[in-house]
A protein has these predicted regions:
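Cofactor-cradling patches in redox/metallo enzymes
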Residues: 36-124
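C-terminal helix of von Willebrand factor
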Residues: 135-146
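Short helix-loop-beta junction
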Residues: 23-37
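Short acidic-hydrophobic, aromatic-tinged amphipathic segments that line or gate anion-handling sites
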Residues: 127-137
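Glycine- and acidic-residue-enriched helix-capping/strand-helix junction motifs
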Residues: 14-21
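Short, flexible coil/linker segments at domain boundaries that flank nucleotide/cofactor-interacting
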Residues: 1-4, 103
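Conserved hydrophobic helix-helix packing surfaces used for dimerization/oligomerization
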Residues: 5-8, 108
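Conserved catalytic or regulatory cores that recognize and/or transform ribose-phosphate-containing ligands
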Residues: 124-127, 146
């Protein structure tokens, strides 16, 4: 992975859990990567992805910040986590931001509760790396390909 690549880390507005995102930001910055944390407007948009306006907010955030790797954290209800994450991935694929020849987003990570991580790993056949909490700094960086 090249140091010019940009990591965008997201969570929903209702999820107050920030320790994992804060740790990832510190680790990535220590390795000289640029990290963008989603502002409140993007966090709110992630909660309402069925809205075209919310979709545009997220796509604009990714494009304007030239984000190559996206991390999503959701440590509340596992079913909600899978639904929100699924809508995000579907949007990124539909708009050719992910898993297409012209895609700028090379990888997506998910951090959440074990049941949500299990379902996401099953649904995406290992294409999405997950974090369940408690990973060492070395494990975190290794999962992120660093």
């Amino acid at each position: 992975m090249r140091h010019e690549e940009v990591f965008g880390l997201m969570k929903t507005l209702v999820d107050a859990h920030t320790m994992g995102i804060d740790t990832a930001v510190s680790l990535l910055r220590e390795c000289n990567y640029k990290v963008i944390v989603s502002p409140l407007r993007v966090q709110k948009a992630l909660e309402t992805l069925e809205s075209e306006e919310s979709q545009r907010i997220i796509l604009d955030w990714i494009k304007s910040n030239k984000i190559n790797h996206i991390g999503v954290s959701y440590r509340l209800d596992p079913r909600d986590a899978v639904n929100i994450f699924g809508r995000l991935v579907a949007l990124l694929k539909k708009e050719q931001y992910f898993e297409s020849l012209s895609a700028n987003v090379k990888s997506i990570y998910f951090a959440g509760l074990k049941p949500a991580c299990d379902e996401i790993e099953r649904e995406y056949s290992g294409r999405i790396c997950t974090f369940r909490g408690g990973e060492s700094p070395e494990e975190t960086l290794m999962v992120m390909g660093i």
